[in-house]
């Protein structure tokens, strides 16, 4: 009896210890996590040169972290981020890259140390109180020749209804976790390695990440399906008052497309109306969808007709939406694949206590931007309606982008931070 009791106690103790080890391992997480974000950007605006290095980004000189996050540039961008569990303050690391990147044998990863700017500058003046925005937001959606019944959806800033604002700005987007530039993580590009990603760069091939505390097995292969997407080439035809036909190049490895346009016009009482339109079959302000989405999320959105299928190559912005707008900007995003790698590889039926030694994720997108209605005016010039056909079209100064506020910033202005 005593032996049986002793065995039972020993078994219970061992089970408890094993459970504690599992819980501890789960709390620790992988020894290293690596994220890579790839982005291809293109801008098609009359007056802006089609070539010229890095496009809009090239005007700033050099390469800086965060290039894959925004829009409005031209060319390829890549951001990487490394987290090492044993060194939460960050480590100096190396990312060995394939020759097809045309950027040398490796990239340098440096710990991110955010600058504490608070208190660095003394100001005597009292901060001005932010002025409450005025006017309305008009929301349209759907491809087609005509505006659909029940549109637009209108939000009046004068009401300042929290519930209405929250409902109006809700979106179908749910970006997957990737590069964020977190403190203590090691990043590329950085102040010591700011090479630009060339237009002919390819991520295909073997990659290896090393550094203090990084497992020597952190190596992975990138195939063609997880390489940079081609650039979005937008072509528009027609004026906003008649409807604008938009065409683009379909992409082999794209999972779906989403278009979003915005403009501004004078509304009632002289206040400014902001006008939003998206290619979705359901109302969506579009802001959260203009970023990386996981393939599973994109598949759901295609099924819900929020995102256009990858075989789609055209869409018409209905007539009359932007006919009174003081310039309208059209943005498009092509969602790419997502590569998720771990070591050891995740089993099909992984137990609850399964824990990889390291993980790596590569996200891919391609974005394009153009001005609605400007393509027609350029064709008019070439056809002789604006000037003689034999007369060369002079390069105009770059067209300024319409100053349309971000809804998130508007919400902060209305309800505070």
Regions found by a protein language model. Name each.
Residues 194-216, 325-339:
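Short, aromatic- and glycine-rich surface loops/edge beta-strands on solvent-exposed regions
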